[in-house]
A protein has these predicted regions:
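PLP-dependent aminotransferase-like
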Residues: 68-157, 164
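Solvent-exposed, non-membrane alpha-helical residues enriched in polar/charged side chains
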Residues: 22, 26, 40-44, 64, ...
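Short, conserved catalytic or interaction motifs in soluble domains
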Residues: 58, 104, 132, 183-184
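Conserved active-site segment immediately N-terminal to the catalytic lysine
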Residues: 155-189
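Phosphate-binding glycine-rich loop
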Residues: 29-77, 91-95, 100-103, 168
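Glycine-rich phosphate-binding loop of ATP-grasp-fold ATP-dependent ligases
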Residues: 190-194
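N-terminal "arm"/small-domain region of PLP-dependent enzymes with the aminotransferase-like
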Residues: 1-29, 34
């Protein structure tokens, strides 16, 4: 007996998207062309107003580059949720810093502020909340903790395109945010990150 594969997520790709990809392919400029800059501008305007964006090859790379830009590296610790995709912790580890896993709130599956507070050490430099399944992390409490301890906040918004908290876009609360466009995300470009 065979069982057909049931894809966990199948993006909706219509003729408009297919035509847009074909138009770019016909130009021969398939990397860093004008469509990339337009996408960066439109993404910011629509989803995270008042910020800037740089398109990269993946959400993991977006997290990694943000951490490097902030000077995170060996000897530093970044608090991450215990329930997340591997990229969250891996992006910290590849900088040479140490990911410190903090427990989640079992009702929201996002970082527990109490667990974050308990995880802070003298080496802690940042908190990396994950806005999961479109549900924002408790940013008010996390920002208060970050301010009290002089920590940065790096938002992993890979699964929260368009989500808001108190009328404010996720991705606009921290020092930086990263989004993913992997096919299983709620907005895809086949691959990519911002």
């Amino acid at each position: 007996m065979t069982h057909p594969f049931i894809p966990p997520a199948r993006p909706l790709i219509g003729e408009e998207e297919i035509d847009a990809v074909a138009a770019v392919m016909r130009t021969g400029m398939i990397a860093q062309g004008p469509q990339v800059a337009a996408f960066e501008d439109e993404f910011v305007a629509a989803l995270v107003p008042g910020t800037r964006a740089v398109a990269v090859n993946s959400g993991t790379s977006a997290l990694h580059l943000g951490l490097l830009a902030a000077g995170i590296g060996p000897g530093d610790e970044v608090i991450v949720p215990s329930f997340t995709f591997a990229a969250t912790a891996n992006s910290v580890a590849i900088t040479g810093a140490t990911p410190v896993f903090a427990d989640i709130d079992p009702l929201t599956f996002t970082l527990s502020p109490a667990a974050v507070e308990a995880s802070i050490t003298p080496r802690t430099r940042a908190i990396m909340p994950v806005h999961l399944y479109g549900h924002p992390a408790p940013m008010d409490a996390l920002q208060a903790i970050a301010t009290e301890h002089g920590l940065m906040i790096f938002e992993d918004a890979a699964q929260a395109h368009g989500a808001t908290l108190h009328g404010r876009a996720v991705g606009s609360f921290g020092s930086f945010a990263a989004f993913s466009f992997y096919p299983t995300k709620n907005m895809t470009s086949g691959e990519g990150g911002m």
